[in-house]
Amino acid sequence: MLSKLARLQTVAGLGLGVHSSVASATSVATKKTVQGPPSSDYIFERESKYGAHNYHPLPVALERGKGIYVWDVEGRKYFDFLSAYSAVNQGHCHPKIVDALKSQVDKLTLTSRAFYNNVLGEYEEYVTKLFNYHKVLPMNTGVEAGETACKLARKWGYTVKGIPKYKAKIVFAAGNFWGRTLSAISSSTDPTSYDGFGPFMPGFEIIPYNDLPALERALQDPNVAAFMVEPIQGEAGVVVPDPGYLVGVRELCTQHQVLFIADEIQTGLARTGRWLAIDHENVRPDIVLLGKALSGGLYPVSAVLCDDEIMLTIKPGEHGSTYGGNPLGCRVAIAALEVLEEENLAENAEKMGIILRNELMKLPSDVVTTVRGKGLLNAIVIRETKDCDAWKVCLRLRDNGLLAKPTHGDIIRFAPPLVIKEDEILEAVEIINKTILSF
């Protein structure tokens, strides 16, 4: 297990940095077109001039989305193979979710938690029964859910497990990603996330992912309150653990009285072919984190699910959010979950994912070295040369009508909305194949 300080020293020695082949977008026009809507170039320049430079977007300016497709401001149509990092599992602007938002937006949108509202309880009952937990704590963003889970784990550690006050530890897996707050980057092994932002959160330890012996060693420490892990690591490049890993995590956490926190923000809600990715191994974590597709991409909604022994350790006034549990977000989340159920999107993700991976396996191995994933959360690894890398492949995919984004330099994630059909998968694969063969 490495502390943040030890990891910083190691990384400093390695001299790791941002993928060197990522180039700046071509210089853009400086003036808006005299007539008509803004051009893509104008939009690129305006964001660059007035917005913080904390993202490096693929140069495409979108204005509309429907189902599995998006259109740019010039009217060009694209397959969306990112799905806003799996936030639009139900497809862009799903009519049922849009209607739910419209039905609520002119009634009541925000009360804060100072008062009750008539939608929160309906949502809480639905989501807890759906996932079989006693309680839900509603938040807004995925990273807020992660922060909430860490607070719950520490409070449980002190009040239930009996860890000495302020000595609780939480263990994370190397390669994890759950956000950009100070807590989240304190658990990160990615220097792009944490370098230059210390000092870091105490009591966070990191072990290798997919390594049960390392977890067993870490849990020997009686002050460990929780182990937080992604069932499949998304931002790390769709890293799928060995069969039995999650079962082993459950057994070790139970044995050592440690909470098993499953970060299902990206992997959950039908993305991997099951309601939750942990369902592939039929394990029940102590805490489950949901977000992204919990609103179908219409509104920021996240949730922390657990049983009373954990949830009720936090008392009134000890945690909260002005927007968490607001009636608009709750109404949207109910509709988003109903769409997943009614349209059997987990089953479709399972079937379409098999087809997609089978087709991706046919790509030339001198360019694509690895294909991996579950359901419709997939990735390919690009063999880098002076003429070919993941960024260049994504630019050419864009030119050919498909949007995807590199992660960790040589990896491209393919995660279309779960409403995609077989003929659409095959059409998209034709674009991918054509693009790869052009290098």
Curated annotation (Swiss-Prot):
Cell compartment(s), UniProt? Mitochondrion matrix
Any signal peptide, and if so, which residues? none
Acetylation in keyword set:
yes
| GO BP term (any one) | L-proline biosynthetic process
- Record carries keyword Calcium: no
This protein's pathway: Amino-acid biosynthesis; L-proline biosynthesis; L-glutamate 5-semialdehyde from L-ornithine: step 1/1
Reactions catalysed according to its record: L-ornithine + 2-oxoglutarate = L-glutamate 5-semialdehyde + L-glutamate
Q: Where is the transit peptide?
A: 1-25
* Post-translational modification N6-succinyllysine, affected residues: K102, K107, K362, K405
GO terms (molecular function) for this protein are: identical protein binding; ornithine aminotransferase activity; pyridoxal phosphate binding
Function of the protein: Catalyzes the reversible interconversion of L-ornithine and 2-oxoglutarate to L-glutamate semialdehyde and L-glutamate.
State whether it acts alone or in a complex, and with which partners, per the record. Answer: Homohexamer.
What family name appears in the similarity comment?
Belongs to the class-III pyridoxal-phosphate-dependent aminotransferase family.
Q: What is this protein called?
A: Ornithine aminotransferase, mitochondrial
Name the species this protein comes from.
Bos taurus (Bovine)
